[in-house]
C-alpha cells in the first residue's frame, strides 16, 4: 500500500546530484536520508552536529507519523548514532528534516556531502484517550519494575 506524502525540495541538488528518498527494495521499510551540506563535516568524538537533508515533508494524515532512525552500519562500524536516538516527525510538522548525528566513537568521523545518514520510516499512530481507574485488573506481569521478568 502506498500513501501519498507531500515532499518539498529545499536544496536544488536533490533530484539532480542526489536522488529523492526512495525505497531500495520492495521489502525496505525505510528510505535513506542524505547529508545535503555545502562542505564535508568532521564530527569529533563526543560531538553532536545537526545536518540538513535538503527536504521537508508534510505527512498531513494524523493517523501517520514519520520517524528518523539510524543506519545500522554507521553506528556499529563508526559509532555514529542519532543524537536524539529517534527523531519523531508529527503529521502536522512542515519544516526541514534535520538529522542529529552524535559521534559516540573514539575517532573523528567525516560525513561527506551526499552521504546516507539515517532512514525515514512512516508508521501508524493511535492517539490514546486515558480512562482513569483506581486499580488495574491483575495480569501475569503485574507491577514488577525494570528487570522483573528476567532474561531467560
Swiss-Prot record:
Report the SUPFAM superfamilies cross-referenced here.
dUTPase-like
Question: Which GO annotations describe the biological process of this protein?
Answer: dUMP biosynthetic process; dUTP catabolic process
Give this protein's Gene Ontology molecular function annotations.
dUTP diphosphatase activity; magnesium ion binding
Indicate the family of this protein.
Belongs to the dUTPase family.
Enzyme class label = hydrolase
Quote the protein name from its UniProt record.
Deoxyuridine 5'-triphosphate nucleotidohydrolase
Per the entry, which co-factors are needed? Mg(2+)
Q: What is its EC number?
A: 3.6.1.23
